[in-house]
Amino acid sequence: MSGAGNDFIVIDNRQGLFNLTHEQVRAMCTRRTGIGADGLILLETSETADFRMNYHNADGFPGTMCGNGGRCAVWFAHLIGIRPTGKHYRFEAGPSTYEAEVTGEESVRLHMLPPSDFRDGLQAGAWNCHFVDTGSPHAIAYVNNLDQLDVLTEGGNIRHNKELFPDGTNVNFLEITAPDALSIRTFERGVEDETLACGTGTVAAALMSFRLGKVTSSLVRVKVKSGETLMVGFNEMMDEIYLEGPARAVYRGTITL
């Protein structure tokens, strides 16, 4: 499945048949020799919500919250006939519960939890960075030449700055394009590469840019590396936030493990 270019292997595991090792997950997510994906999602049953999203990064290990993965999980649930018990879908992801709704054909709006740990003035080598946690940790740096930037090298250097980020971080480079719009490129921890989109990074970018006065609208259009646009809406207190955009089933298949 693809969430604005962020791609995932999604498996219906409601019967609990799959107990994948991190080696199996990594092999499946490896491009050219496996299926290839930024992460893997096991959709499982939940006692308190409509389903549980069990998310693993491409390195095979459990990941923190994945915004585009959450939107894809909701669209997948819709496709396999799971219907919300209330007005919105409710699903577990890690220790938290999220709400989301299908807003159109292949379109999902995910309601995010409030951000935490805003930090400014972080000097990572030559980069002046900001930081916020939107369910996953995100460093943010502003540039004027986003298309020419070597995200793999520069993002990797910031991601591995142990003094600032002992557990590592995702890294987002932003270019403001309008009072209500920006472009973003993201180096993702756990994928260890640039991805075509990052949902929690997109939310982090919009919130940080509004907080710093770089955008003035509380509805921000974010163009990701794939060329698609994600929408981030929020109130002034940043305790009501949503991420909305495309979520598509690209193909179905089987694999022998």
From Swiss-Prot:
Sequence similarity: Belongs to the diaminopimelate epimerase family.
Site (Could be important to modulate the pK values of the two catalytic cysteine residues): H138, E188
Matching PANTHER family: DIAMINOPIMELATE EPIMERASE, DIAMINOPIMELATE EPIMERASE, CHLOROPLASTIC
Broad enzyme group: isomerase
Transmembrane segments: none
Chief subcellular location: cytoplasm
Function: Catalyzes the stereoinversion of LL-2,6-diaminopimelate (L,L-DAP) to meso-diaminopimelate (meso-DAP), a precursor of L-lysine and an essential component of the bacterial peptidoglycan.
Binding site for substrate: N6, N57, G67, N68, N170, E188, R189, G199, T200
Biological process, per Gene Ontology: lysine biosynthetic process via diaminopimelate
Listed GO MF terms: diaminopimelate epimerase activity
A Pfam family annotated for this UniProt entry: DAP_epimerase
Reaction equation(s) it catalyzes: (2S,6S)-2,6-diaminopimelate = meso-2,6-diaminopimelate
Localization, UniProt: Cytoplasm
InterPro entries in the record: DAP_epimerase_AS (IPR018510), DAP_epimerase_DapF (IPR001653)
Catalytic residues as annotated in Swiss-Prot or TrEMBL: C66, C198
Pathway membership: Amino-acid biosynthesis; L-lysine biosynthesis via DAP pathway; DL-2,6-diaminopimelate from LL-2,6-diaminopimelate: step 1/1
Subunit structure: Homodimer.
Domain of life: Bacteria
UniProt lineage: Bacteria, Pseudomonadati, Chlorobiota, Chlorobiia, Chlorobiales
Protein name: Diaminopimelate epimerase
